[in-house]
Amino acid sequence: MSVSAIFGARVVTIPSVLRTSSVDGRTVKLQPSTGGSCGGGVITIECSSRPQKKGTAHHMKTRPKKTARWDIKRGPAVYPPLPPLPAEWTIVSSAVDEADSSSSTTSSSAEIAQSA
């Protein structure tokens, strides 16, 4: 829950007047600064009166609502399952490679003999 939801649009917090700090076993009293850009140590939080919705919240707010009686209990469309995907990798054995290379060599030598 945000601060603006509890206390309203504007919240002002005032730090304590005196603070104590111990340095090397000695107690030192510190006072808030009276100058600077914060106006004397006062913190002001301003909240937007109309905050902007983020992605999914905005989508859920603006999407069409089911108002028709037949549409209220309707589920998502059912499609037939997709066919299985082909394998990305196929295993090729070295014996098949040797047979392919020897057959291609003999066929190429036969082609050379025919052309000569």
UniProtKB/Swiss-Prot annotation:
One of its GO terms (molecular function) is rRNA binding. GO terms for cellular component: chloroplast; ribonucleoprotein complex; ribosome. Pfam families: DUF5323. Residues 1-47 form a transit peptide. It is found in: Plastid, Chloroplast. Keywords: Chloroplast, Plastid, Ribonucleoprotein, Ribosomal protein, RNA-binding, Transit peptide. The keyword Zinc does not apply. One of its GO terms (biological process) is translation. Residues 95-116 are annotated as: Disordered. InterPro entries: Ribosomal_cL38. Component of the chloroplast large ribosomal subunit (LSU). Mature 70S chloroplast ribosomes of higher plants consist of a small (30S) and a large (50S) subunit. The 30S small subunit contains 1 molecule of ribosomal RNA (16S rRNA) and 24 different proteins. The 50S large subunit contains 3 rRNA molecules (23S, 5S and 4.5S rRNA) and 33 different proteins. Belongs to the chloroplast-specific ribosomal protein cL38 family. Component of the chloroplast ribosome (chloro-ribosome), a dedicated translation machinery responsible for the synthesis of chloroplast genome-encoded proteins, including proteins of the transcription and translation machinery and components of the photosynthetic apparatus. This is Large ribosomal subunit protein cL38. It comes from Spinacia oleracea. The lineage of its organism: Eukaryota, Viridiplantae, Streptophyta, Embryophyta, Tracheophyta. The gene is PSRP6.
